[in-house]
A protein has these predicted regions:
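Active-site region of PLP-dependent enzymes
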Residues: 200-214, 221-298
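Catalytic PLP-binding core of fold-type I/II PLP enzymes
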Residues: 153-168, 174-213, 247-250
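Hydrophobic residues in well-ordered beta-strands that form the structural core
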Residues: 120, 141, 193-195, 227, ...
């Protein structure tokens, strides 16, 4: 037998070594393009390291968020230079979590309520706009410029009303929109800015902050950024997405919406880290009601 007299660790390593060899032999054959060949604009980009990690995770058979999730969130946050990153199952879910975060009662008067307006564009992928419509907010569409297909920032003031609460737009095909103007507009009118960064992971933008020119990654200049890891994007998990922010309160709300609306912030498999799981009062619920099963965002 292939694993006879081997420990589980040794057997696992043997499998992973064979997976790496299989990938290099059958999946990564590189040939030159010939005249008339179809050259895709986007595709899966991977090598044996990704395939080994995929199989390693499968052998562990941990079927929900686990150590690879934790590692990825830390590395992506570090790469982007933000404090918080939350992995979700798709870029569409990332946009949904980002928008729904703005509806939280914890945001007070700045929360988005049904009937409030969100400035965006119609020329783009639908899931940038869909969360607002699904919730009952009103998208206010601004035209785009040609050939960039990004928002025409000169028309922002025309789209503003007393009901405007946020701007949620994408960087089209990796080309950043006019962040200087959009950011200044949002700050002037106390609006939330959500950057759909699904097309622009790794794109950098230079703008003035406190009298200095500062270069940051797109997706980190607004209040919340989102990414997608669907195969046509810069890197892939098959599916997958991420929501990131520097704001601790927004991060708390993002995590709550991601985890069924739960109020408790304890990670999976760990309970009562705060030491107050059973001694709180929640409205008319009995004193000591289990905080782990309190849901503050539904």
């Amino acid at each position: 037998m292939a694993f006879e007299h081997k420990t589980e660790t040794e057997a696992r390593q043997q499998i992973l070594d064979m997976v790496a060899e299989y990938c290099d032999t059958y999946h990564n054959k590189k040939g030159s393009f010939q005249e008339g060949d179809r050259i895709p604009y986007a595709s899966r980009v991977y090598d044996h390291k990704e395939m080994v990690n995929l199989v390693d995770s499968s052998l562990e058979f941990w079927l929900t968020s686990g150590r690879y999730t934790d590692e990825f969130e830390k590395k992506l946050a570090g790469y982007l230079g933000v404090r918080f990153c939350s992995l979700v199952n798709s870029g569409s879910s990332a946009n949904l979590a980002a928008f729904m975060t703005l509806t939280s009662p914890l945001l007070g008067e700045r929360r988005v309520k049904r009937g409030d307006e969100i400035i965006t564009v119609a020329c783009g992928f639908p899931t940038t706009v869909a969360p607002a419509i699904q919730y009952g907010a009103v998208p206010v569409f601004v035209d785009v410029t040609i050939p960039q297909y990004n928002i025409d920032a000169t028309k922002l003031e025309e789209a503003l009303s007393e009901k405007t609460k946020a701007v949620m737009i994408a960087h089209t095909l990796g080309n950043p929109f006019d962040l200087r103007t959009v950011k200044a507009f949002c700050e002037k009118h106390n609006l939330w800015l959500v950057e759909d960064n699904c097309d622009a992971l790794g794109t950098q933008y230079t703008m003035e902050e406190d009298g200095k020119e500062v270069t940051r990654f797109t997706g980190t200049i607004g209040d919340i950024g989102t990414s997608s890891f669907y195969p046509p994007h810069h890197m892939t998990m098959g599916e997958g997405g991420a929501v990131y922010t520097d704001n601790p309160l927004l991060n708390k709300i993002i995590r709550s919406f991601r985890d069924w609306g739960r109020d408790c912030v304890c990670p999976s498999g760990r309970d009562n880290m705060c030491g107050h799981r059973f001694d709180r009062q929640f409205g008319e619920l009995p004193l000591g009601y289990d905080h782990k099963y309190v849901y503050s965002h539904l």
